[in-house]
């Protein structure tokens, strides 16, 4: 019996709702497979913890998480706590503290979900966006001077290192090489950002020589939004900086139908530390407590987690169950359905068990 220890951090907004759904589905997979077990410990870190303790997580939070095989994360952010506090107090310290430098965000149109793109047919939108997750625009360097005065100034410094850019390019090329189309698009803005982004382009060209079987091209980030919208079938694997990929992956989720179906994995490819898996939709306080949050993104990121742990059969079984459920029209309101979170979750669990969901 293979055993895994998972740290669950539901955190804020709809995070607890979708993580509860995800844990229910993982339990169903565990029962169906019969050859692995998942032991979960839940941490109450997040905005409520901050209001009580003045920090989003305890000082030894990373040390507590080191003993786990993976982290299952909900969402962070609250209306009454500044966003820079919630993000820099919990999610980013985990990503950067554990050097989860590869943020992997798959996107495709699931059966039964109608995308907003008029000319997008089956298979036309099937991408993986690789986001540099450790430096770039979110490196945390900068400051403010003369605060409150007319001459106040704020700086936000993007940091690009040869080590950081090389490893994310190599990861992206390897991923593209493993996918059927062997196609990679490198997103840049080197026409206007003439230092870090020019280095980014140069390193992409250097790394490409290691992968002669991968076809790659380069695209300015603003033009990339147009290409994603008008020619989705021309794309497959995409690599971009921390900020650019953050924006483009939200666009990708929307083009696939909803952020409620968009997952992400924060990976330490060297496996020195636990990797973290989460939906990208955020805390969504406008629907918190209504029971209508879409759990599909959480199921998909659970599949990413299972695959990372080596349970590929269980990951495939989970995604097959999700696609059976969406194809049957059991959908939450954000993708045009009338089902609630629990109904979708129960249907996926039944599909995993082999029951007839129709």
Curated annotation (Swiss-Prot):
Positions of Mn(2+) binding: 222, 246, 250
Catalytic activity: tartrate + NAD(+) = 2-hydroxy-3-oxosuccinate + NADH + H(+); (2R,3S)-tartrate + NAD(+) = 2-hydroxy-3-oxosuccinate + NADH + H(+); (2R,3R)-tartrate + NAD(+) = 2-hydroxy-3-oxosuccinate + NADH + H(+); (2R,3R)-tartrate + H(+) = (R)-glycerate + CO2
EC annotation from Swiss-Prot or TrEMBL: 1.1.1.93, 4.1.1.73, 1.1.1.83
Pfam families reported in the protein's UniProt record: Iso_dh
InterPro entries xrefs: ICDH/IPMDH (IPR050501), IsoCit/isopropylmalate_DH_CS (IPR019818), IsoPropMal-DH-like_dom (IPR024084), TTC_DH (IPR011829)
Induction: By tartrate.
Protein family: Belongs to the isocitrate and isopropylmalate dehydrogenases family.
Function as written in the Swiss-Prot or TrEMBL entry: Has multiple catalytic activities. Apart from catalyzing the oxidation of (+)-tartrate to oxaloglycolate, also converts meso-tartrate to D-glycerate and catalyzes the oxidative decarboxylation of D-malate to pyruvate.
Protein name as catalogued: Probable tartrate dehydrogenase/decarboxylase TtuC'
Organism: Agrobacterium vitis (Rhizobium vitis)
Underlying gene: ttuC'
